């Protein structure tokens, strides 16, 4: 039974899932909004909001922690210097998920995740 299980497996190994969330986070940072499947968007929301909350402190240790999670210097700098200060007065809810369509090939529910 999977009662109270804390995250979605997304039918991937743990390393693959970590790489997926990292790559989606980098894309969201660069573009501001991306289209993906609904379960991926819901899992990404949790991951990305933790990044922004951590970056809100603005100290060097937060910068290092975010770089450790993303391994992408440009995205790390963007989150710490541009995105996090914009949400300094906000307690969570940095992203929005909008359900869009059913994908033609496999009828998967698609969604747009964007920064508020």
Curated annotation (Swiss-Prot):
GO terms for cellular component: cytosolic large ribosomal subunit. It comes from the Bacteria. One of its GO terms (molecular function) is structural constituent of ribosome. InterPro entries: Ribosomal_bL17, Ribosomal_bL17_sf. GO terms for biological process: translation. Keywords: Ribonucleoprotein, Ribosomal protein. Belongs to the bacterial ribosomal protein bL17 family. Part of the 50S ribosomal subunit. Contacts protein L32. This is Large ribosomal subunit protein bL17. It comes from Sulfurovum sp. (strain NBC37-1). The gene is rplQ.
């Amino acid at each position: 039974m999977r009662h109270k299980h804390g995250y979605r497996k997304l039918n991937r190994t743990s390393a693959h899932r970590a790489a997926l969330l990292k790559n989606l986070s980098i894309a969201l940072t660069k573009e501001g909004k991306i289209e993906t499947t609904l379960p991926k968007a819901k899992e990404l929301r949790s991951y990305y909001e933790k990044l922004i909350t951590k970056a809100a402190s603005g100290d060097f240790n937060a910068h290092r922690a975010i770089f450790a999670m993303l391994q992408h210097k440009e995205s790390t700098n963007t989150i710490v210097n541009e995105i996090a200060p914009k949400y300094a007065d906000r307690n969570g809810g940095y992203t929005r998920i909008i359900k869009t369509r059913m994908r033609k090939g496999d009828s998967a529910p698609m969604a747009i995740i964007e920064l508020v």
